[in-house]
A protein has these predicted regions:
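Carboxylate-rich, polar loop motifs that coordinate divalent cations or form catalytic acidic clusters
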Residues: 1-284
Length: 284
């Protein structure tokens, strides 16, 4: 069963808006909710929500290695102390459309951009530094949209773009490989929406209408999974992937799906959200 929470204009301790953009469960098991109208923190004792920020649409949340909560509001990177709520704000110009945040094992904060590739955040100098997304053959992805980032077992960054999967060597600052549907690599769709590295170091790749692709360590090919075929149900895009109790939970346009890798079975979980415009869509 699912418990549902809605915005109530008469109650400041409800979620700020019904359009939820992102969720974060931090290392203290607290749940942060980013919506179209701000940031909320779930209060488990009172079963309601504490308003943290009402300054705009929050569309990405993460916790860094210093336990700070990092989130994006338009072109502003916010870094907040989760105890005092004191927040540093780093505002960038309109030419920098920030889309995604990821901290690697060396504690560097990487920023996926809407239309200008990959950058990393130089906190000391309050600026974004370009990463080089150019192959040795001259093929260039520096103007790509980077939707998602994960670190591979080898320490490289895998980037999700609208032009396939990119592999970036962060030590050498260069692109070392890219995969597209047109190649004989098994990738089912070029527009990649989500990435997830599981406990076995496999990387699961959520696509725009092309199901899920599995990328295993030390391989250069992808194994496509099509949940809609086994479920006989249209699920659309794979928006998010999370591992929980040895199963993968997939947030899709058509609802929540639970995948069991042991027997390769799928379970569909209908949500039945009242008054929902997007019906069963699960973003995260």
């Amino acid at each position: 069963t699912f418990t549902q929470y809605f915005h109530d204009p008469a109650n400041q301790y409800t979620i700020s808006d019904n359009c939820i953009k992102h969720l974060l469960c931090d290392n203290q098991k607290r749940i942060w909710v980013g919506s179209m109208k701000g940031l909320n923190l779930y209060n488990k004792e009172t079963d309601d929500f504490i308003p943290i920020s009402t300054n705009g649409s929050v569309f990405w949340l993460m916790q860094n290695s210093q336990n700070e909560i990092c989130y994006l509001i338009n072109n502003t990177l916010c870094i907040m102390n989760p105890v005092t709520y004191v927040t540093e704000r780093f505002q960038f110009g309109d030419e920098h459309k920030i889309y995604f945040l990821y901290e690697d094992n060396d504690k560097r904060l990487w920023v996926g951009m809407w239309d200008s590739g990959l950058k990393w955040f130089d906190r000391k100098n309050h600026k974004l530094v370009d990463a080089n997304l150019t192959m040795e053959n001259g093929k260039n992805f520096n103007n790509s949209q980077v939707n998602y980032i994960v670190e591979t077992l080898e320490g490289n960054l895998m980037l999700a773009t609208r032009e396939g999967v990119l592999i970036y060597d962060r030590q050498a600052n260069r692109l070392i490989n890219y995969y597209q549907r047109e190649q004989s690599c098994g990738l089912s769709e070029n527009t990649i929406i989500s990435l997830y590295r599981d406990k076995a170091n496999n990387i699961w790749i959520g696509t725009y209408g092309g199901g899920v692709n599995l990328y295993t360590p030390y391989s250069n090919f992808f194994i496509p999974h099509k949940p809609e075929y086994k479920l006989q149900k249209s699920i659309g895009n794979i928006n998010a992937i999370v591992e929980y109790k040895e199963k993968l939970w997939l947030g899709t346009d058509g609802g929540l799906i639970i995948y069991n890798p042991k027997d390769e079975s799928y379970e569909y979980c209908p949500l039945h959200v009242p008054r929902s415009v997007t019906n069963n869509e699960v973003k995260y």
